[in-house]
């Protein structure tokens, strides 16, 4: 399911640890700039991260990438693994237009 950054950040504010912001870009992209409080889990290693127990199934996962394509793939995979609260919030291009510069 795709929602906007604003919807995701507003709707899913909950207890610490309940909502996580997941960046599925590669490390070099993340280092160039990322969302506040984002955690890096590249799409290329997402299967291993899930197998290693990186996420809890009751957590809200707000997933993004550069444009929304990789985050869409990541959400499809996460949902297929039982993470029903995985949401594609698009890409950093959308974020910068709406909220301004990224963190480094």
Predicted region positions:
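Rhodanese-like catalytic fold shared by cysteine-dependent sulfurtransferases
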Residues: 1-20, 27-60, 70-104
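Short, surface-exposed ligand- or partner-binding patches at beta-edge/loop junctions that are enriched
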Residues: 64
């Amino acid at each position: 399911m795709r929602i906007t950054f604003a919807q995701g950040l507003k709707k899913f504010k909950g207890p610490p640890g309940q909502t996580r912001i997941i960046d599925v870009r590669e490390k070099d992209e993340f280092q160039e700039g990322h969302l506040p409080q984002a955690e890096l889990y590249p799409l290329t290693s997402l299967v291993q991260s899930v197998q290693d127990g990186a996420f809890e199934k009751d957590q809200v996962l707000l997933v993004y990438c550069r444009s929304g394509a990789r985050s869409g793939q990541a959400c499809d995979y996460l949902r297929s693994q039982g993470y029903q609260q995985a949401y594609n919030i698009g890409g950093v291009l959308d974020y910068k237009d709406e909220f301004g510069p990224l963190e480094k």
